[in-house]
Amino acid sequence: MTSATPLPVLPDYAELHCISNFTFLTGASHPSELVERAKLYGYQALALTDECSVAGTARALVASKEHELKLIIGSRFTVRNADGEPWLRLVLLAQNIEGYGNLSEIITHARLAAPKGEYRLLADDLASPQGELAHLRGAPDCLAILLPDYDPDPQQLLAQAWWCQRVFGDRLSIALELPLRHADDRHRGTVLAVSEQIDVPMVATGGVQMHTRQRKPLHDVLTAIRLSKPLSECGLELAPSAEQAMRTRMQLAFLYQGEGGEKILRRTVELAALCNFSLDEIEYEYPSEVVPEGMTPAEYLRAETFAGAARRYPNGVSEKVHAQIEEELGLIAELGYEPFFLTVYDVVKFARNEGILCQGRGSAANSAVCYCLGITEVNPDSGNTLFARFLSRARNEPPDIDVDFEHQRREEVIQYIYKKYGVTRTALAAALITYRTRSALRDVGRALGIDLGIVEQVAKGQAWWDSRKEFAQRAGQQGLDPESPLVLRWAQLVDQLRGFPRHLSQHVGGFVIAQGKLSRLVPIENAAMENRRVIQWDKDDLESLRLLKVDVLALGMLTAIRRTLDMVDALPGRREHYGATAKLAMQNLPDDDTETYDMICRAETIGVFQIESRAQQSMLPRLRPREYYDLVIQVAIVRPGPIQGGMVHPYLQRREAKRNGNTDCVTYPGPEVKAVLERTLGVPIFQEQVMEIAMKAGDFTADDADRLRRDMAAWKRKGNLTQHQERLVHAMVVKRRYDPAFVEALCKQMEGFAEYGFPESHAAGFAKLAYVSSFLKCHEPAAFFAALLNSQPMGFYSPSQLVQEARRSHVRVLPADVTASVWDSTLHPRADGETGEDGLVQPDIRLGLNRIRGMRKPAAERIEAARAQAPFTSVEDLAHRAALDRHDLNVLAAANALKSLAGHRRQALWQTLALQEPGHDHALLRQARPVEAPLELPAPPIGEEVMADYGSLGLSLQSHPVELLRARLERMRFATAATLAGYRNGQLARACGIVTVRQRPGTANGTIFVSIEDETGAINVILWPHLIERQRREVLNAQLLGVYGKWQCERETRHLVAQHLVDLTPLLGRLATSSRDFH
């Protein structure tokens, strides 16, 4: 009887070569999964070494703190020779903060030397960098690990090792990775021989690419996606086994048995002990040039704040505001944030000096300092602000100041930042693009070799809210067996891939600006957009590392408002009408206009800011805003937070009761609560109100209240509200004898704020823009809609819908025409001089040439310049004097923009085709050309005209597509939107229209809201879940939708509750329409 082989002693181990899914389409595990598994296996440390990247390190850091595992920051590189050919692979590990800065600069240099998504690191970049990079020679303060190829050529490995030893000296080790393949013994012998020959120690590494072997199928799919091949064609490019998964220490002990194995494993822990850098050591330094010489940041911020206060309050600063300013300045100084406020102030000051509309949003609107600096527009003297919502001692993260700028002029602001601070000190934050259901379905389906047509149909039929059960049904509808191994494998891999990083994009506007070289704090790489650079961390990473960003955001409505005001200002008599002594501005508009609020209460808000969506339009006739603060509530109440917290219906009921004279409809359990909730009729609509109650009635400090805010936001993920709720119960019920039912309801409402909700200050800022845009639509509709058209792309509605709404607002819209149009849509005096009820003449809108698909701006500018010299006499004259080529003439003819020179579309196209190559013919030949009788072509039928309009302009002024089908629809007994408006509540009805909007709010329990449009207006349709499941294809895909259902109307709220749907899209023929789906 033989004795069993004794088990080896479990070795101490640190994994020093590990990539995550931030090595895009290669790593098959999240950083947090790798950290958790390393801790489970008893590793001493884990080095995250993604390919020329530290993008995943911030998330790994959070996980390492949670699991109490040492995290080492590193990166893997392929080093190329002088010819640019791959030569060797190595890992660099940061030993300290200097080493991390050097590593970050090396990554930056390699990334900026290549297009987005790639990198290029030459041997000379490490061995003998020149100029500003000379200090990176040999990657000081970084450990280097040479990664030999599997079963390498001994001479080639020797050459690689000699070079690495010369560059990195005694900081070099040679990795021994054993993937349990056919040549492991020979591989081990070769690496050992080279190690001994040049006296460089070996170290065990795993080349980890997944935390568990069960991820091997996903790893294969990622490889196939990366190679753009189906799995069946990948062959040897797939990993031969799952040995790139993390190994237990028992597995490692067996694997590295034999000569030197124990030493090789021990070396991992020795190297880990030499790496003592944490991302927490990164110290961000603010830019200093925003502070004038001779002043400290605190002195300058105080001076500018009180100078701004004097401008904001010409009659004197109230004691309340003065005290708030002093409190804020004290806390800002304590936390050292003055340079950040001054940096944002500098950017805003530039924008205002250049006439660029801007406005701060979010919790920054709680700050009196921000208001006085002109960053935000919410007056702390008249609004309800809570500074703790914006900044507190307890918050272990920087303040968040988001500023919206006109979206068409934001580039000027961005270039100002680059020019002021330089490209080495500033870059945009990254936006991490991850796999969602449809993208995962498509990529996995292709990798599995499923027919592309089937893949596309299944992906199109799969909505974001669908479960795996619905996926199986969609696959079955395409002829696949839902229970087949292929479909089950497809579903499983999609589940795994969903949420995986795909690539880094650029954040919508978050700039990180540093005092010194930004690339020593975080690597920088090229963005897809020219002259853009992004760092490798996204906004969440920046918050976890306490790095500040300046958010330079784009808001289309600011562009539209500025353009509207400019056009109105140019109209005769308008300045006098609005009492403006200089150029018309928002401040000149009355802030309590009755007609504007009447229009809002009728939900005629297409095109205006924030209150134009289907959900907002449904709420407006119920809430019926009559003043500014009503709009603040309106903007905020249609959000998941208030809805899930059960706050909407109680508020509306109390508002209605109060409107009907019932002044006793609201009671308060105590004066502290009344002081906070009186403005919202006893219902906490805003998160700040819960914080205020906690402070005034629950004995919370400002820092305690901020912790409550954070825990409310994280309740769904962490469920950590109990301690706060218990504290409130004790303070309010036990101590102050409040009604327990009220406190219990408050605690439930706190859970509702785990869903998204607007801060009151944010809603207040947006309400201002909602009112201004509503006023302009009500009183200056021509300028407003022309500005919206010129500000595209933006907003909730398409240009076609905006033009329809302009016409419903009694604005005449004239077609694009080369004899009258310029690039933008413009205002033209009405020939009849008709005035509105306010005595103002409303001009017509002339569509601009920018509405024509394929039209190029330089050609439009040449047309305008030539027309200014003399009117065009013919298409030939136009082509010659404006130097238009065949493309220009064809798109103009297709858009019917040559009608005044050539007649209808067919005639115009014929004339353009009859010309020689425009812009290049000679005058002598033109004079000698024979005169021929023009060929008269028949005009196209109206249906063809409308289709051509939509194809070229995306809209038609001649007829609505549904109007062309009206005779047929009447035979099918479909009523128009105008007819439905007269139906009684509960009447059976049927309607047909083009689908313009589909929405499925997360708070609507699966209900979908659809808007359809016919020639007389829009119809709001409600689809209940049972109908959605029964008629899914019609719900998701129909462009022209017939609806059978029951009409519901209450005051101004009208909608059609669907009972049956019909997809009538084929009736549209080749007409292409578009809808805004599930945004």
Swiss-Prot record:
Gene3D superfamilies with a match to the protein in the record: 1.10.150.870, Metal-dependent hydrolases (3.20.20.140)
S-adenosyl-L-methionine is among the record's keywords: no
Q: Does the keyword Nucleotide-binding apply?
A: no
Q: What's the source species for this entry?
A: Ralstonia pickettii (strain 12J)
**SMART domains linked:** POLIIIAc
Note the NCBIfam families from the entry: polc, PRK05672.1
Matching entries from SUPFAM superfamilies are given as:
PHP domain-like
Q: What is its main location?
A: cytoplasm
PANTHER family xrefs? DNA POLYMERASE III SUBUNIT ALPHA, ERROR-PRONE DNA POLYMERASE
Q: Which GO terms describe its molecular function?
A: 3'-5' exonuclease activity; DNA-directed DNA polymerase activity; nucleic acid binding
Q: For this protein, what reaction is catalysed?
A: DNA(n) + a 2'-deoxyribonucleoside 5'-triphosphate = DNA(n+1) + diphosphate
**InterPro entries referenced in this protein's UniProt entry, alphabetically:** DNA_pol3_alpha_NTPase_dom, DNA_pol3_finger, DnaE2, DnaE2/DnaE/PolC, DNAPol_HHH, NA-bd_OB_tRNA, PHP_dom, Pol/His_phosphatase_N
Gene label: dnaE2
Q: What is this protein called?
A: Error-prone DNA polymerase
Per the UniProt entry, the Enzyme Commission number(s) are 2.7.7.7
Q: What does this protein do?
A: DNA polymerase involved in damage-induced mutagenesis and translesion synthesis (TLS). It is not the major replicative DNA polymerase.
Give the similarity note: Belongs to the DNA polymerase type-C family. DnaE2 subfamily.
- A GO term from the CC aspect: cytoplasm
What's the top EC group for this one? transferase
* Subcellular localization, as worded in the UniProt entry: Cytoplasm
List, in alphabetical order, the GO biological process terms annotated in this UniProt record.
Answer: DNA repair; DNA replication
Q: Which UniProt keywords apply?
A: Cytoplasm, DNA damage, DNA repair, DNA replication, DNA-directed DNA polymerase, Nucleotidyltransferase, Transferase
